[in-house]
Regions:
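Glycine-rich phosphate-binding loops of nucleotide-dependent enzymes
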Residues: 1-184
Length: 184
């Protein structure tokens, strides 16, 4: 830190105080259009997840809706059930009660693969530990959730050329930086 000065709060504006804190003028108000959320895309009703090790519920009777166009954040102190709730929604953890509806379809008892087919995705909080296989190439990591789809296999065998074609497309589309392309 660097000393920027001393001011009397009652004689100082928010703009002046923020300028002293940041070192430049800061726009304190953002002009934006009012949000117009769409239809309900995720409906969570009374979700409960029991933790057998702790012999109590880690998530109890959680209910909320997410509308098209909304971004929802789950916040709280570590250990208060956010991870378990996400695991329950994505199928990684079994619910002991409640219902999950995605785009009007009850997915409560669906497998992870079926939830993925239905359009649900999950970005884990630790991407390196749970989001990819570090020993796999970039192209193999890019098809982890879809290797079973017909376009990537034939007769039960992975079609490497199709996997590479798909991963090269994603690398170009999202400007992915890698040492040697998709085989990295």
């Amino acid at each position: 830190g660097k000393y920027m000065g001393t001011v009397d709060i009652k004689d100082t504006t928010k703009e002046e105080l923020s300028r002293m804190m940041v070192g430049r003028d800061v726009q304190l108000q953002v002009d934006k259009k009012p949000a117009h959320p769409g239809d309900v895309v995720l409906d969570v009703e009374g979700v409960t997840i029991h933790n057998d090790q702790r012999k109590k519920d880690s998530v109890k009777d959680v209910t909320f809706q997410v509308h098209a166009g909304e971004i929802v954040c789950l916040a709280g102190i570590e250990g208060n059930g956010q991870t378990e709730l996400v695991y329950g929604l994505t199928g990684l953890e079994k619910l002991s009660g409640g219902k999950i509806t995605l785009d009007g379809k009850d997915i409560t008892r669906e497998s992870i693969r079926q939830r993925s087919k239905d359009g649900m995705s999950h970005i884990p909080e630790d991407r390196h530990k749970h989001g990819l296989v570090l020993d796999y190439s970039l192209e193999n990591n890019m098809v982890l959730q879809r290797y079973w789809q017909p376009e990537f296999q034939k007769g039960g065998f992975i079609q490497s050329d199709k996997v590479r074609e798909y991963s090269d497309k994603l690398i170009a589309q999202y400007d992915v930086r890698s040492g040697q392309g998709s085989s990295t």
